[in-house]
Amino acid sequence: PDGGWALCGIRFRQRDNARPFVDVVASTAPPTPDGLATIAAAVAPAYDPWHPLALRANLPDPDEIIAAVRGDSRFVGMSVDMYVMAGLVHRLRTRKRDIDDRLRLVPGSPGELAARNAGIYGELYRRDPERARWATPEDADSLADCADKGLLFEVRVHDEPAGVVAAMRWDAHGMCGFSVEELALDAEHREKGLGPVVLQRLLRKLPADDGDALWGTIHHNNIPSLRNALRVGREIVGANMWITPAGWSGMP
């Protein structure tokens, strides 16, 4: 109504037709309760045939916006889907390192590491079936893109395979730099404090320019990955948020 705009699209969470949502990619509306209510009112008629459960938008301060909508009758609720965590590469490289000379990163084959990655995730799903709702392994095509940039590695401990780590140059969320595309350790090597060491080794491999960041999105339930990111110095700089306007069902 005020001449603003919002770039949106209908999407389905993990391709599940029962979980449609409106993805707000960009907008002139501010990331405030008033701005989000304006977007919801404007897009609801256009996407009503799909019966979307929620909006999803990237917002800069998740705790602040959640507090701001609490008690606001225009919203049923709001929650974090994925945290955006980032740090400048040159600063992360200067932080105190976790020393573990057993661990190395070795360039690997996309096909072989994709199969290994799928096996790691399969084992995780068997232990925690709920994880399959929000965590999916990077496939051979995705890992091949990382390999093309020299940023696909097998994690080796005592020269034995231990997992997969991959990154990609990707400018997003207002940042230039590299995205952590994958970090998966097999069961034998999880919960041993190796995650931060892998990230520190990865930082040394990045062909980073001044001002480049290492960033990634981490699901709010993925506590080990959140801890690893914080331990190497990355910070929460935003989040992909589920926003449930009044009259919408909400994302389960």
Say what each PLM segment does.
Residues 77-89, 235-249:
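Conserved catalytic-core motifs of GNAT/GCN5-like acyltransferases
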Residues 1-50, 60, 165-187:
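Conserved donor-binding loop and adjoining core beta-sheet/short helix segment
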Residues 129-183, 187:
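A conserved beta-strand-loop-helix scaffold within acyl/acetyltransferase catalytic domains
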Residues 57-64, 215-226, 230, 242-247:
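Conserved beta-strand-loop-alpha-helix junction that forms the acyl-donor binding cleft
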Residues 94-138:
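Short amphipathic alpha-helix that is part of the acyltransferase structural core
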Residues 27-112:
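Acyl-donor-binding surface of acyltransferase catalytic domains
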Residues 14, 247-252:
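Actinobacteria-biased recognition of intrinsically disordered, low-complexity terminal regions
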Residues 34-44, 185, 191-208, 226-231:
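Conserved acetyl-CoA-binding loop-helix of GNAT-fold acetyltransferases
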